[in-house]
Amino acid sequence: MSSVLQLLLEGECLETHQMAEILGMDETEVESELARLRDEKVLLGWRPVFNPAEVEDDLVRAVIEVKISPEREGGFDRLALRISRFDEVESSYLMSGGYDLLVIVAGKNLRSVATFVSERLATIDGVLSTSTHFLLRAYKEQRHLLVEEAAASDKPAVSP
């Protein structure tokens, strides 16, 4: 793995001259490596990690288990890509187990997510079934704990 990529994955927001200093590289080498990582679609971008409860007032997120029928040519890929192109879809993954795709969606409210699932996702040819799970609370996001340690350990003592 590229040392520049490893430094990015550690989560610090650094300028190229800071990265060069940490890695013992020339700044132009770091810039060149970042350009290569972008060109090769290894580095797709980066975004700040935030606490959804503090930023997204009414945003509703859901995890959807989707069973799909693989196609003779291309298996799951064509249908998975079609589903992934919807604006509501934040992430999608091919899974092993009881369902084929794990789709994470976001909407402005519960109704918009429900409408997306019932009218747009479930009606696609090849989608056999969906199971939607609404996210109620986030405890960890992108390796960052979102809940204060004191609150997490405030549980009643268990008496024998």
Q: Language-model segments: which ranges?
A:
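A compositional/biophysical signature of low hydrophobicity enriched in polar/charged and small residues
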Residues: 1-160
